């Protein structure tokens, strides 16, 4: 699962693999499964403006690659002490090829 965040100036930040970037749930947690709350945390550069859009994408791998996402909450930080932007995106849709909107 990857995440691309955008600001209103056209800048973006890309996390190509959420789990390896900052999965906090432990080595035996089954990420992206029904009923689970998955939490990720990592550091990166802040965008020029607040996060205003995001693109969450599945690579379609795995036996049961479909995943229903309720929401994505993002806090952009350059350090543990300085937060640049926080936003919550309501998603409420499947990321799957076999359920509407049939997109990963």
Swiss-Prot record:
Protein name in UniProt: PLAT domain-containing protein 3
Domain of life assignment: Eukaryota
| PLAT domain ranges (all copies) | 1-104
Origin species: Arabidopsis thaliana (Mouse-ear cress)
Which gene does this sequence derive from?
A: PLAT3
